[in-house]
């Protein structure tokens, strides 16, 4: 008996971007839903967001065409960045010297999983909770003194 396939991948190779800079963005979207991932990538100010968002769109289109899954049920289950080839050039400098220039590339793989097809989703994967929510935060009013009077700077 074959197991039903619930995960689809999209791969992009030789992106002219450092692997460390791409990992900074990939770490933020791993484990999140498809719609939340697109919102995060739209609002992040990094250059790596554009090729990663195209890759997320491609993975969702692959899931839609291969499995017929709805985009609302997709979760980024696997996201990895590997180093690619490095192009080496030389920049001519004064007095016949030269400095090496390394143009680094990377390979990015995005895997999306359809949670409606997976029975064990609740046990294995859970959506990331926002880090900024803390149940112990309290509001501090700076314009009220310890007795409760309103403090005016005038």
Curated annotation (Swiss-Prot):
Signal peptide range: none
Domain of life: Eukaryota
Any one annotated GO CC term: chloroplast
Keywords: Chloroplast, Plastid, Ribonucleoprotein, Ribosomal protein, RNA-binding, rRNA-binding
GO BP field: translation
Coiled-coil boundaries: none
Any Pfam family: Ribosomal_L22
Membrane-spanning intervals of the chain: none
Compartment(s): Plastid, Chloroplast
Gene Ontology MF terms: rRNA binding; structural constituent of ribosome
InterPro entries: Ribosomal_uL22 (IPR001063), Ribosomal_uL22_bac/chlpt-type (IPR005727), Ribosomal_uL22_bac/org-type (IPR047867), Ribosomal_uL22_sf (IPR036394)
Xref: HAMAP family: Ribosomal_uL22_B (MF_01331_B)
Role played: This protein binds specifically to 23S rRNA.
Quaternary structure note: Part of the 50S ribosomal subunit.
Family listed: Belongs to the universal ribosomal protein uL22 family.
Name listed for the protein in its UniProt record: Large ribosomal subunit protein uL22c
Organism of provenance: Jasminum nudiflorum
Gene: rpl22
């Amino acid at each position: 008996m074959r197991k039903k396939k619930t995960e689809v991948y999209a791969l992009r190779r030789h992106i002219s971007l450092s692997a460390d800079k791409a990992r900074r963005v990939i770490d933020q979207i791993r484990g999140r839903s498809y719609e939340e991932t697109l919102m995060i990538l739209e609002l992040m100010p990094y250059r790596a967001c554009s090729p990663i968002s195209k890759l997320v769109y491609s993975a969702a289109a692959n899931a839609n065409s291969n499995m017929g899954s709805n985009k609302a049920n997709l979760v980024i289950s696997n996201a990895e960045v590997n180093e690619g080839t490095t192009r080496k050039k030389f920049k001519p400098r004064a007095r016949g010297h030269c400095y090496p220039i390394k143009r680094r590339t990377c390979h990015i793989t995005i895997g999306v999983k359809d949670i409606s097809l997976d029975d064990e989703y609740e046990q294995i994967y859970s959506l990331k909770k926002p880090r900024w929510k803390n149940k112990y935060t309290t509001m501090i009013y700076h314009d009220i003194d310890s007795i409760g009077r309103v403090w005016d700077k005038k």
